[in-house]
């Protein structure tokens, strides 16, 4: 893994910082694990924008990732590491002893030729997947299930991890990178170690066009709009918006709590750090 700062041969290259990983596969992805990934430009079936700042970008195939890791007791060899345009983490193509291939999120430190395994009896080693009740307290994990059997939902992006800090009956307590401490059912599965490609946060795209290649459109300030488009819009000349900052739909947008799922508040031991 190398961090490369490009020479300023043009204004668009001046600030580019690239993450170069020589271990990534340079060929095409494994075709049986690809799916069509159509773009909708952030529009729904009525043609109305439901997600802002989405549109354009390079065509992509979706890589089918094994987030459940339910193939127990069968060891798998890591064939290669690959880039995935759909996420910040890299992915690993693994070949099971019975001949099946699957993609998994590539943990930190894993290389081609390494062996990974899942199941209750899997050893405590980076890349192995076990129920949380079988993982020692103090261990670092990623790809954590919130509901047993649903598949990993927590700590899936580049450099992400959670730490097991306590075990109490049917639950284990995790400390997330945000500082939040929450309880998770101990029957849910997690993968040992942390997600690789942690240098992802150091990259600099360098120009607006590189963001457009990724399918992200510009964010326009509300005060630059007309009154019909945003509560901050309109006015003669430049204005401050004339009110406390709100979203395009009038919801206070700075420091206003919008969490609605009160039924799961009981699982949050401590809120995240501000």
From Swiss-Prot:
One of its GO terms (biological process) is cytoplasmic translation. Keywords: Ribonucleoprotein, Ribosomal protein, RNA-binding, rRNA-binding. It comes from the Bacteria. InterPro entries: NA-bd_OB-fold, Rib_uL2_dom2, Ribosomal_uL2, Ribosomal_uL2_bac/org-type, Ribosomal_uL2_C, Ribosomal_uL2_CS, Ribosomal_uL2_dom3, Ribosomal_uL2_RNA-bd_dom. GO terms for molecular function: rRNA binding; structural constituent of ribosome; transferase activity. It holds the Pfam family Ribosomal_L2. One of its GO terms (cellular component) is large ribosomal subunit. Residues 223-274 are annotated as: Disordered. The keyword Repeat does not apply. Signal peptide: none annotated. HAMAP family: Ribosomal_uL2_B. Belongs to the universal ribosomal protein uL2 family. One of the primary rRNA binding proteins. Required for association of the 30S and 50S subunits to form the 70S ribosome, for tRNA binding and peptide bond formation. It has been suggested to have peptidyltransferase activity; this is somewhat controversial. Makes several contacts with the 16S rRNA in the 70S ribosome. Part of the 50S ribosomal subunit. Forms a bridge to the 30S subunit in the 70S ribosome. This is Large ribosomal subunit protein uL2. The gene is rplB.
